[in-house]
Amino acid sequence: MKDQLLVPLRRRPWTCQKCLQRLQLPRHQTRRSFETAASPFPRPLDSLPADYARTKTVDDDTLRRVFDSQQFWREFSQQRAAQPKPTGLVQNQYLTSPDGFRTFANVSLQKCQAIVSKVLAASTLEEYRTMARDLDRLSDLLCRVIDLSDFIRVIHPDPQVQEAATQAYALMFEYMNVLNTTTGLNDQLKKAAANPEVTSQWSDEEKIVAQILIKDFSNSAIHMPPHERQRFVNLSNDISQLGSSFVNGAEPAKSHVSVATNNLRGLDPILVQQIKRWNRTAAVPTTGMIPRLALRSVHDENVRREVYLASRTSSKRQLHRLEELLLKRAELAKLSGYESFAHMTLSDKMAKSPEAVSNFLTALVESNRKLVREELSQLQVMKGAPLQPWDHAYYVHQRVLQYSQARRSRELSAVPEFFSLGTVMQGLSRLFDRLYGVRLVPQEPAPGETWNPDVRRLDVVDEAGRHIAVIYCDLFSRPNKHPNPAHFTLRCSREISAEEVAECASLDQSSHPNDGMATAVDPVTQTLRQLPTIALVCDFPEPGTNGGGRPSLLSEHSVRTLFHEMGHAVHSILGQTRLQSISGTRCATDFAELPSVLMEHFATAPSVLALYARHWRTDEPLSEGMIRSMERDRTAHGSIYGAVENEAQILMALVDQAYHSRPADGGRIDSTALYQQVSQQHSSLPEPADATTPPTSWQGFFGHLYGYGATYYSYIFDRAIANKLWVDVFGAGRHAVDRAAGERYKNEVLRWGGGRSGWECVAGALGSANESNADGRLVEGGDQAMREVGRWGLGRDGVSG
């Protein structure tokens, strides 16, 4: 596999990035008549949909209880335990045992090979007219195996299943790399796209998908002569290996700083005992939690300075890895005909160019600067002397303590009592019901359907009772589970053609056109659709095991995290396009975080809190006084550190651009000099630059330089847009549960997936009368549009508690 083409630049031609991401509900009580392939198309008995006749009220109550009561969940989840034949993982008919992964991959591989043969042999107009759809199906078949196997090999507790999933992943990934070098596919697609008699019959979606694939082929060196293509392959593999080494090899130049223990006053004495040595000194480590706590709490400024400098200075070996990575990327861009790696990476993003990103970030620095000065001036008054970078965490902590002692409401400590996981899930369902007319319905999992007994299955239904998506919620902590919250698209939405159904029926009586996973018949077109299947993973504490035990109670931060991941989910669920390559979150990298960041605003809006925030034991709603206290607390925290945190993110994005915008013939890269240059030019608390202090090299710890090379600006870009939509579409919370606002956002943004320019989505949501969109300045994007978004700013983001 190492000799095949690896393309770490952007979405590969035959797979799309998994954003780690979505959901919805109805208004009047209705009997759900679940429309699926069960009637018109053959499917195994064990994958038939369960009873959907439960009322909306019962569903709503059940939703809360399946997450809050372990006893209720055990009883609820055992209702299908007697089913004689096990269902495969996530209803996939092949995955009833570890060996099933091999079968699943081989069956999918055979279907892929048949499509490739068809495309390569195409010669008639009719054959060329189906090409975009054929290649989209090829992409779907690859993603079916790669995305699901990649998820299962990480999340499943059984090593045998992990290994089987890894082998299936490797098989299809290697085949994908073979396709990347199959020049005939590129030639045939370009021939189809150049023929007006073909493209005149294509839908807008087919045209978009064709252009995406052509661009991806171009970025995969498919058009190069053999010797250049081999060089491209070698560079891509080098970048992959260097990137992995860079991410995993972060290390400081010094492992610890030696400090006299009596100079560590302020640090937790228990921690001091842990690092204390025999000679009345302590070895303060330069990585991990202890140096962060030292910067926040040690009273001695000289100690803080020493810890700060050491913890932000990378080893020479790590800096060499980074600089080699940047050189290889620049060379790859030059080989591909681009001025720089940033030019190559940004060409299909909303930003389009490094210059536009620079305009955005520069405007953002200016819009944020006044707030930064306000925050730093307050800290400087506390210190009574010029503020240094190693002072910031310390004096922020002091201010937070002062605020907590003087003004923070004691009742805020009780807020998590109103945020049981079940009530929050109930609130999300009710919110989606009001905004989009979709809701979440707990469903009993079939035997073998989930990878752990604690995984809850939710079906998403619309107001007509139609099933539109499946969500697997793996939200509780357990040993060896990855702690980071994430959203995974296990299967994208897509229209399944009648030809596929017929092909499936001819192969095997038990075969299913969506591998047994969820499908439904579109009531308008009467075509079969594969439904989006999503996994949400979090690490919340488990509820009590007895019947009256405490449920999992969430902090405000955890509530916002769950809303964030559900924002990704709602994009997947409502962005149901006919072709999978542009469904849901399969959009430009600098647009993908918009729905999730916007969802965070809803979490603490008073009208949304009224939907769900109730005491887990008494069912008493969160009082208006407590809601006001939470808002004051958030505002206070934001005014203490929010703008400086914004500036830190902006600086990281500027460093990323500085590294990746250098021309390929620029020679060796001094990453530390560039980092220091950005810091001195844009930071309000720049790194020390005096001759007696060696320059810091924090860039060696900036692992996102690999995974988000040239696109690190995306998150703050989407934050600026989300803030704007929150104010101008949802009235800063006044219309947070308003159907008209929800429909506007759904119809202009969510439903398109990646089938519409992000700029068109934003402009459509704001409307032509919006001052920021005067003269249609946003629709076409470009430098001025990026600068306009920068002027919107990021505000201040604080978290209560």
Swiss-Prot record:
CDD domains linked: M3A_MIP (cd06457)
Coiled-coil intervals, chain numbering: none
Cofactor detail note: Binds 1 zinc ion.
Location in the cell: Mitochondrion matrix
Binding-site list for Zn(2+): H564, H568, H571
Positions of disulphide bridges: none
Keyword Transit peptide belongs to the record: yes
Alphabetical GO biological process terms: peptide metabolic process; protein processing involved in protein targeting to mitochondrion
Predominant location: mitochondrion
Keywords, sorted A to Z: Hydrolase, Metal-binding, Metalloprotease, Mitochondrion, Protease, Transit peptide, Zinc
EC supergroup of this enzyme: hydrolase
Reaction equation(s) it catalyzes: Release of an N-terminal octapeptide as second stage of processing of some proteins imported into the mitochondrion
EC number annotated for this UniProt entry: 3.4.24.59
GO CC terms: mitochondrial matrix
Cofactor(s) demanded: Zn(2+)
Function: Cleaves proteins, imported into the mitochondrion, to their mature size. While most mitochondrial precursor proteins are processed to the mature form in one step by mitochondrial processing peptidase (MPP), the sequential cleavage by MIP of an octapeptide after initial processing by MPP is a required step for a subgroup of nuclear-encoded precursor proteins destined for the matrix or the inner membrane.
Family statement: Belongs to the peptidase M3 family.
Protein's recorded name: Mitochondrial intermediate peptidase
Organism: Aspergillus fumigatus (strain CBS 144.89 / FGSC A1163 / CEA10) (Neosartorya fumigata)
Organism taxonomic ancestry: Eukaryota, Fungi, Dikarya, Ascomycota, Pezizomycotina
Gene field: oct1
